[in-house]
Amino acid sequence: MEIPVPVQPSWLRRASAPLPGFSAPGRLFDQRFGEGLLEAELASLCPAAIAPYYLRAPSVALPTAQVSTDSGYFSVLLDVKHFLPEEISVKVVDDHVEVHARHEERPDEHGFIAREFHRRYRLPPGVDPAAVTSALSPEGVLSIQATPASAQAQLPSPPAAK
């Protein structure tokens, strides 16, 4: 069963390097789609004596995916600032939430770029697939949430019309 979930317009810090003086060139859950390497990642290839001269302090923290499944609740935050709302689709397929975003080649400050990504998240047991909602913040953070089926059953039903 496939259920489309509309994306409605409506901080996260990159993990630190595993060892001092070492900068890993990216992690599995980093959501920096098509942004290239950081200066710190390039500087890790330089000798330690000259690397500090090439580094600038980061002005903003880089976002990562943040997934939470506490107590059967499901929540995902993704940075999709490089995509327009109509370029993003969120749908529920069986017990998974699938996120797809794509934009055609367009100019940027370095030339031209095209981006595309797919993410698939398994819903935890007890979460109602029909309760999945998504919203896009003005800053470009996609929020996907769902509550346990038991929490849906406890919600009061609207009064019947007379």
Swiss-Prot record:
CDD domains per UniProt: ACD_HspB4-5-6 (cd06478)
Location of Deamidated glutamine modifications: Q66
Function: Small heat shock protein which functions as a molecular chaperone probably maintaining denatured proteins in a folding-competent state. Seems to have versatile functions in various biological processes. Plays a role in regulating muscle function such as smooth muscle vasorelaxation and cardiac myocyte contractility. May regulate myocardial angiogenesis implicating KDR. Overexpression mediates cardioprotection and angiogenesis after induced damage. Stabilizes monomeric YWHAZ thereby supporting YWHAZ chaperone-like activity.
Residue numbers carrying Phosphoserine: S16, S157
Gene it is expressed from: Hspb6
Gene3D superfamilies the UniProt entry points to: 2.60.40.790
Protein name per UniProt: Heat shock protein beta-6
GO BP terms: chaperone-mediated protein folding; negative regulation of cardiac muscle cell apoptotic process; positive regulation of angiogenesis
Main localization category: cytoplasm
Region (Involved in stabilization of the HSPB1:HSBP6 heterodimer): 1-72
Subunit structure and binding partners: Homodimer. Small heat shock proteins form high molecular mass oligomers containing variable number of monomers; these oligomers display a very flexible quaternary structure easily exchanging their subunits. Heterooligomer with HSPB1; formed through oligomerization of HSPB1:HSBP6 dimers; subunit exchange leads to formation of at least two different heterooligomeric complexes, differing in variable quantities of HSPB1 and HSPB6 homodimers in addition to HSPB1:HSPB6 heterodimers.
Keywords: Chaperone, Cytoplasm, Nucleus, Phosphoprotein, Secreted, Stress response
InterPro entries with a match to the protein in the record: A-crystallin/Hsp20_dom (IPR002068), Alpha-crystallin/sHSP_animal (IPR001436), Alpha-crystallin_N (IPR003090), HSP20-like_chaperone (IPR008978)
Pfam short name (any one): HSP20
Domain sHSP: 56-162
Sequence similarity: Belongs to the small heat shock protein (HSP20) family.
Modifications after synthesis and translation: Phosphorylated at Ser-16 by PKA and probably PKD1K; required to protect cardiomyocytes from apoptosis.
Localization per record: Cytoplasm; Nucleus; Secreted
Lineage of origin: Eukaryota, Metazoa, Chordata, Craniata, Vertebrata
Keyword Nucleus found: yes
One Gene Ontology cellular component: nucleus
GO molecular function, one term: protein folding chaperone
